[in-house]
Amino acid sequence: MSLSSHQAILLVDGYNIIGDWSDLKQSRDRHGLEAARYELVECLINFSAAMAYRTKVVFDAHYQDTPRSTETYTAALSVHYTAFAETADTYIEKFCATFARKKYQQESTRLIVATSDRAQQLTVVGYGAEWLSAPMLEREVGIAVQKTNSKTKKQTKSKPPGRFLFNTLDPAAQKRLKQMRQGL
């Protein structure tokens, strides 16, 4: 998908969100950071698709002496690991500064940053980005899940019974097909 097909770019401070959402905290405490990261990414893949967001989840190098890396999960979501000694905050601030300079806004794209870090909030808003706290993002994700589930239920109810192609035809076509089968 091209940038213009997305309504917004969502930058997520991964560890900040994990530290705030109770389900992710429990997963982190029971199974480790990797499990919590996986759950967050899975959750945001669906959310990004439902909202037509291009999402970048940013994780600190977390004491790992590794170079910066990116893992692309879908066309709408990628995970960015910062370089050693680079924080997610720094990565997000640099992205916001570049975003403001390059004027992605001309393409009517919004930039949203999800973090509960107050200093980060003030910085990104200063660059013209929108801000979502971790609890606000959790609510937005919950609303998107409910909407998706209700759409799925409506589609399931509207499906014709049976597994035959005949059942998918409109009544006039079914009548004509019956006549053809009977040789009329």
Predicted regions and their residues:
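Nuclease catalytic cores that cleave nucleic-acid phosphodiester bonds
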Residues: 2-5, 9, 16-184
